[in-house]
């Protein structure tokens, strides 16, 4: 049993040495092994290099190259916070802040529904309504010009009453109805010729002469 326990301890110790051969770290505590090799992972926790390393310019500095400063950061994977001015900037290229969409304006009433917010924003449109009384002034001037025109027909109304006064003239024929009754009363006048029948009978006096002739004819 003791031999089995010792065998387990030795296996664990050797396995740890093979898995992490850089247990002894350098004095700077960077996590780099003292004797690195090509088949070991980078660092004990696989962390990026520290930020205080001196930046390295990757552009070759040969004699014909006059543009050696690109302005790029040495560690492009380190991003700056949004809204913070960039330390590294390419000349002739717009800033990232200029490419960003401008933020929306702050709303004065964050808890008010949009319909009420827009109606409250439309409230300043009331001053143009106050200017409408100035437009009503010409309306008051129009009745003044209409009064004389309206008065003239009023003065002409008596002329229109003249036909009303002429109605008695129309009543004159009504008064003539008795004249129409006159023919009714003329009937007695028509009876007057009846007494004149004797006057017509005067020529009829010779009638006895033809009557005998008729009698003779009858005989």
UniProtKB/Swiss-Prot annotation:
Primary localisation category: secreted
This protein's UniProt keywords: Secreted, Signal
Region (Disordered): 155-219
Entry's Gene Ontology cellular component terms: extracellular exosome
Bias kind Low complexity: ranges: 155-204
Statement: the UniProt record of this protein carries the keyword Transcription regulation: no
Subcellular location: Secreted
Signal sequence extent: 1-15
Transmembrane region(s): none
Protein name: Proline-rich protein 27
Gene: PRR27
């Amino acid at each position: 049993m003791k031999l089995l326990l010792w065998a387990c301890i030795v296996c664990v110790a050797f396995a740890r040495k093979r898995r992490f051969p850089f247990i002894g770290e350098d004095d700077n505590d960077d996590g780099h092994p003292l004797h690195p090799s090509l088949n070991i992972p980078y660092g004990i926790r696989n962390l990026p290099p520290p930020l205080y390393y001196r930046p390295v310019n990757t552009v070759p500095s040969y004699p014909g190259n006059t543009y050696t400063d690109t302005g790029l950061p040495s560690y492009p994977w380190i991003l700056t916070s949004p809204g913070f001015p960039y330390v590294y900037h390419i000349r002739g290229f717009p800033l990232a802040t200029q490419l960003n969409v401008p933020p929306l304006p702050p709303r004065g009433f964050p808890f008010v529904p949009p319909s009420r917010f827009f109606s409250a924003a439309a409230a300043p449109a009331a001053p143009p309504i106050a200017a409408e009384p100035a437009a009503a002034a010409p309306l008051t001037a129009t009745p003044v010009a209409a009064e004389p025109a309206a008065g003239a027909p009023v003065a002409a109304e008596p002329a229109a009453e003249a036909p009303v006064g002429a109605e008695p003239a129309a009543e004159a024929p009504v008064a003539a109805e008795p004249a129409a009754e006159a023919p009714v009363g003329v009937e007695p006048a028509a009876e007057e010729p009846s007494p004149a029948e004797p006057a017509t009978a005067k020529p009829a006096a010779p009638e006895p002469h033809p009557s005998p002739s008729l009698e003779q004819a009858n005989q």
